[in-house]
């Protein structure tokens, strides 16, 4: 951000994936101010922002009006649990940029089922808060269970947890019918890092029970 000639775009993800940690809004505003000054396009991925305790208040989408170089990405698929429809959107106040994007947009970029699902989701205001509270409660419970199992993890604010272990959890859980994300191919992580989703209580119970079984077999 400090040397304009070396940077055209800055991509940030908040909350991040796969760690699930968010950048404080005050700091994001400072970054946006610096990018505006240096004429660097700031692309902010907020696909998991609805899972934060503060919800939409943590979002930078309303700041796009004051920062022309800010482009915010959001999605319906995470908080509303409809990944199959692949529905998301971008927000920017840069009309020239939006016009250029329109010239290369695919003719059928959003399917009819995705449009219908998105419109239906917008009517479910109460469900977003219910989901946020459920995920928060289950995530905190799972973090405590990982501590009890002496498994290192990264505190998260999203609907998943990143943890580290010498055990090949991807293969061990796959044998038991559970799939988690092997994060070995993430830059900066490597072997031994895994991401597991925070799901419904009964599903989380099954995952944790399987992890206990694996550890007991190895003790």
Each language-model region and where it sits:
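PLP-dependent aminotransferase class I/II
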Residues: 69-154
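Conserved PLP-binding catalytic core of the aspartate aminotransferase-like
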Residues: 140, 145-177
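PLP-dependent enzyme catalytic core of the Aspartate aminotransferase-like
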Residues: 26, 175-176, 185-219
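Structural motif
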Residues: 9-13, 43, 89-91
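Active-site pre-lysine segment of PLP-dependent enzymes
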Residues: 3-6, 18-42, 46-79
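Short beta-strand-to-loop capping motifs
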Residues: 92, 163-165, 198-200
């Amino acid at each position: 951000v400090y040397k304009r000639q070396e940077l055209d775009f800055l991509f940030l993800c908040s909350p991040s994936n796969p760690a699930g940690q968010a950048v404080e809004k005050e700091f994001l505003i400072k970054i946006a101010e610096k990018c505006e000054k240096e004429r660097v396009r700031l692309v902010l991925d907020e696909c998991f922002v609805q899972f934060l305790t503060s919800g939409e208040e943590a979002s930078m989408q309303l700041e796009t009006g004051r920062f022309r170089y800010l482009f915010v990405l959001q999605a319906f698929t995470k908080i509303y649990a409809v990944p199959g429809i692949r529905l998301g959107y971008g927000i920017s106040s840069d009309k020239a940029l939006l016009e250029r994007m329109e010239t290369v947009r695919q003719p059928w970029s959003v399917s009819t089922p995705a449009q219908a699902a998105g419109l239906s989701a917008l009517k479910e205001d109460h469900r977003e808060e219910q989901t946020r509270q459920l995920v928060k409660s289950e995530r905190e419970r799972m973090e405590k269970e990982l501590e009890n199992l002496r498994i290192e993890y990264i505190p998260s604010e999203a609907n998943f947890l990143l943890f580290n272990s010498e055990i090949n959890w991807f293969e061990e859980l796959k044998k038991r019918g559970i799939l988690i994300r092997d994060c070995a191919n993430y830059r900066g992580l490597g072997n031994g890092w895994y991401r597991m989703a925070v799901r419904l209580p009964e599903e989380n119970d099954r995952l944790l029970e399987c992890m206990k079984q694996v550890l007991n077999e190895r003790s």
